[in-house]
């Protein structure tokens, strides 16, 4: 229902297949506590409770868009580089869409996050690294050579999914 309401402004492709949705969005607003209100000097502060999304993260909004885009391009694989939350979201939505999913994580990623990713059937690659940026560059270069599009936390397709937050506020 939420996707149908905002379809005209999230225009990454003509037809959004809501089958790939896991129920992201339409999260509630929570009134901020007095500490935050006092710190900001305002009595009118509300917070979006994005933990109500399927993988407990705002990233689900963008991942839905990325998965729909991958399906529109007839891709069979989706991949991401993550320290946990993005990997979990990509694994969940990739599974829903029937995509083979690869998640690249630094070796120091907590096991709790790795387990959450694993339950969705993603292929997990733990990379020994001391520098996340270097790891990311190396993976992106390799993925490009293999013809695999890696979804990131700030790509334009992902941002289309984040638009839904603004529309829920108005």
Residue ranges with predicted function:
Residues 1-170:
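PLP-dependent amino-acid enzyme catalytic core
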């Amino acid at each position: 229902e939420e996707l149908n309401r905002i379809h005209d402004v999230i225009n990454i492709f003509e037809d959004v297949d809501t089958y790939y949705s896991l129920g992201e969005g339409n999260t509630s607003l929570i009134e901020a506590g007095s500490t935050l209100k006092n710190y900001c000097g305002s009595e009118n502060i509300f917070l979006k409770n994005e933990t109500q999304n399927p993988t407990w993260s705002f990233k689900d909004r963008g991942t839905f868009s990325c998965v729909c885009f991958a399906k529109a391009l007839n891709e069979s694989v989706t991949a991401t580089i993550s320290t946990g939350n993005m990997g979990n979201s990509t694994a969940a939505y990739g599974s829903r869409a029937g995509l083979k999913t690869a998640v690249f994580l630094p070796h120091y990623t907590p096991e709790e996050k790795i387990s959450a990713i694993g339950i969705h059937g993603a292929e997990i690659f733990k990379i020994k690294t001391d520098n996340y940026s270097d790891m990311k560059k190396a993976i992106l270069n390799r993925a490009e050579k293999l013809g695999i599009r890696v979804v990131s936390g700030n790509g334009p397709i992902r941002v289309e999914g984040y638009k839904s937050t603004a529309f829920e506020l108005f």
